[in-house]
Amino acid sequence: MVVDPLVMPIGALGSAGSAAFRLIRRLRVELGVNTICGASNVSFGLPNRHALNGTFLAMAAATGMTSAIMNPLHGEEMTAIMAADVMNGVDLNCARWLRKFRGPTPATIRDGAVERPRRERRRRG
C-alpha cells in the first residue's frame, strides 16, 4: 500500500510542511505504509521553487517518505535527495555521492581514465 498525504502549498498554509512531515512519520511508524508526495505541491505560487522542493524532499525523506512525484531533470532537487540519502545512511560510505561529485584525481587522468579536453589533446599530442 502507498499513501499520498496530499501536501498543501506552503504559501497558502504556513504549517503545510510541518503537517506533511508529521503525517508521513505517523504513516511510516504507526502503520508501516509507504508514502509518495508530489514535490512541487509545497512550493506552488512561490519563487525559487526548486530550492523549496529540494528542501522539502530531503526533509520528507528523513521523516519516512519512500517515493516522490518529481522531475528527475531538476538538478537542485536530485542533489537534495542524494544529500538526504547520505545523511540518512541510505548511501553507504557516500558511494553514490562521491561518484557524482568527486572530480578526477591525478591518477585517473594519468592512467587515461579521464579524457583531456580536445584543445589540450591537440597541443600535447
Predicted regions and their residues:
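Catalytic alpha/beta core domains of metabolic enzymes, predominantly
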Residues: M1-R110
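Terminal or standalone catalytic/regulatory effector modules within metabolic enzymes
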Residues: D111-G125
